[in-house]
Amino acid sequence: MKNDSRLRKYVPSLLLFLLFEAVAVTLWLMKDNLFYLLNFSYIGGCLALGTALFAAGKRYARHFAQLAVGSYMLLYLGVISRENMQIEGFWYYLFLGTFEAATIHYAVAKIFGPLLFGRGWCGYACWTAMVLDFLPYKRPQKPRREKLGVLRYVMFALSLALVSGLFLMKVAHLEQIMFWLFLAGNALYYLAGIALAFAFKDNRAFCKYLCPVAVFLKPMSYFSLLRVHCDESKCVHCGKCLRDCPMDVEVNREARKRKNGTECILCYECTKVCPTKALH
């Protein structure tokens, strides 16, 4: 029985790996391009290993996954391969009517994938959060400012308007422009993210208030299969889970599992600090 219980905690990691392998093989066969097999196998393998190490109690397991996947996507896919994997890249390929690069990435990680793993992208693979999570305010020092969340929708609309405008004006050398937008956009994200972290004393302030990608992630995350649950019979309402949650999710009420679950990044910091093991 003990062995079964120990193995059960690795099931999500196995399912994650199998999902990415299914995507890898499907795209490889559909597009007759070995890159898709290697790309999604690498990403899925890193995420599965990172989550498995976390389940085994390894302290820096999530940071391993963040660095392995985030650095690969930022430096290799973005800088070396010159693919704009930001939200502007998604609009670009979508307007071209091409199911490539950013459109595939968004479909898998940010539009349909959240049905399984919610906003796990934000916790384990985002190259912006990869840097922000190393800043000094792991625990938010101030309450979340709910009204500022509207800014992410403004950013979302601006990114759509920018790429739409470039297409409507039929700007020349648009592919090259998208590469420079990728570099400039990431620089602005890092600058804004670091500035907000110190201003609000919260590493994840950018994720809560400005990141436009959350607009894609939140709807499907509402139905996520993977989520943190609270056994209210064990909960002593000590508040440690909320104090340690980087996203200010009120996880200690079972009623929150749908609404507030759209902000949960599955970092499981709450489960580590729960004194009665009420969270799982």
What are these regions (language model features)?
Residues 1-252, 262, 272, 277-280:
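Non-ligating segments of multi-cofactor redox enzymes
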Residues 254-267:
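Short linker/helix segments within small regulatory modules
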